[in-house]
């Protein structure tokens, strides 16, 4: 038993885990939404318990999924870890596995960001480490190398010249990236790493096949798993707009726009499949997702309905 939990909060956590499983399913009916809202509003312990779900999702850095079919846009891996985290709060032994996992390491990392937060850190060598929303990284410098371990989320690196000429490396679950220049971003997804190079080049070694390597040059983007490289593609400048505290979209499907917003906004943001293909262009302040939703409502034939402060539906007019 967890002595910090009252019986009512323990029951609320059990109910929250049930509702999380329901709302992260493939189909969520209006009746289920209404019942969740009723449950959420009827008791402060329920609101506290749901906040624990949100906190776990924020820390775990869930990657947005199919916004048209998943209420909370969480990947299967994220859903599993959230449920384990709730077990941990309930005092169940199985939750300990979360803290022994790489995600658990991330929860104790040197640098972490919550949802909607971008953080900039100047490292001891003068390099700049920028963490995107819901990200975690450890930094280790020794006499031989400078290393950043990305546990989850996304980081941007601007390297500084090192008097000791130590290599600057980023480690992810899928491989090792060595800076051959000054500016690049790295995003940790469930089963692959996304690398975007803005200046100079980055060398990539695969975790399961270190003999294989790939050089990614400025203006290029690469996805890779632990065992194979994807195709090198031209860099999409919009993908790195967050480093300037903005979100930029150029003729993007509304479904993709909403998937991006869910990374920065707490709660449930649902997009009806009937409007997911509408296109949006614009540049918006990253910290004001309400402004983006207002533009969507004003420029596209959609209706934006606030079920609660933390639940918004986007549907056809």
From Swiss-Prot:
Domain of life where this protein originates: Bacteria
Side Cytoplasmic, residues: 1-81
Cellular-component GO terms for this entry: plasma membrane
Gene Ontology process terms (BP): intracellular iron ion homeostasis; iron ion transport; regulation of DNA-templated transcription initiation; signal transduction involved in regulation of gene expression
Periplasmic side: 99-317
PTM comment, free text: Sequentially cleaved starting with cleavage immediately after translation to generate CL(a). CL(a) is then cleaved by an unknown protease in the periplasm to yield CL(b). Finally, CL(b) undergoes intramembrane proteolysis by RseP to produce the N-terminal cytoplasmic fragment CL(c) which is released from the membrane and binds to sigma factor FecI, allowing it to activate transcription of the fecABCDE operon.
Subunit: Interacts (via periplasmic C-terminus) with FecA (via periplasmic N-terminus). Interacts (via cytoplasmic N-terminus) with FecI.
Protein name (database record): Ferric citrate uptake sigma factor regulator FecR
Taxonomic source organism: Escherichia coli (strain K12)
Lineage, highest ranks first: Bacteria, Pseudomonadati, Pseudomonadota, Gammaproteobacteria, Enterobacterales
Gene: fecR
């Amino acid at each position: 038993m967890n002595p910090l939990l009252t019986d009512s909060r323990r029951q609320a956590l059990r109910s929250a885990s049930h509702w999380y499983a329901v709302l992260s399913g493939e189909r969520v009916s209006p009746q289920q939404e209404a019942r969740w809202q009723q449950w959420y509003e009827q008791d402060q312990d329920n609101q506290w318990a749901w906040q624990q779900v949100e906190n776990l999702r924020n820390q775990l850095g869930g990657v947005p999924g199919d916004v048209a079919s998943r209420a909370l846009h969480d990947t299967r891996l994220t859903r599993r870890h959230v449920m384990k985290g709730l077990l941990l709060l309930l005092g169940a032994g199985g939750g300990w596995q979360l803290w022994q996992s790489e995600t658990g390491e991330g929860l104790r990392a040197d640098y972490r960001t919550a949802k909607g937060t971008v953080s900039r850190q100047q490292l001891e060598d003068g390099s700049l480490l920028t963490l995107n929303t819901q990200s975690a990284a450890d930094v280790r410098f020794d006499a031989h190398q400078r290393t950043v371990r990305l546990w989850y989320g996304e980081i941007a690196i601007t390297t500084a010249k090192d008097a000791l000429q130590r290599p600057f490396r980023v480690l992810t679950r899928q491989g090792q990236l060595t800076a051959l220049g000054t500016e690049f971003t790295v995003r940790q997804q469930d089963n692959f790493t996304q690398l975007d190079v803005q200046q100079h080049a980055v060398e990539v070694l695969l975790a399961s096949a270190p003999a294989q390597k790939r050089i990614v040059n400025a203006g290029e983007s690469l996805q890779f798993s632990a065992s194979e490289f994807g195709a090198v593609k031209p860099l999409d400048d919009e993908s790195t707009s967050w480093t300037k505290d903005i979100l930029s979209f150029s003729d993007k499907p509304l479904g993709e726009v909403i998937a991006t917003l869910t990374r920065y906004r707490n709660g449930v943001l649902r997009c009806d499949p009937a409007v997911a293909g509408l296109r949006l262009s614009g540049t918006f302040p990253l910290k004001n997702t309400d402004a983006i939703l207002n533009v969507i409502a004003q420029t596209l034939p959609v209706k934006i309905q606030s079920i609660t402060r933390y639940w918004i539906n986007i549907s056809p007019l």
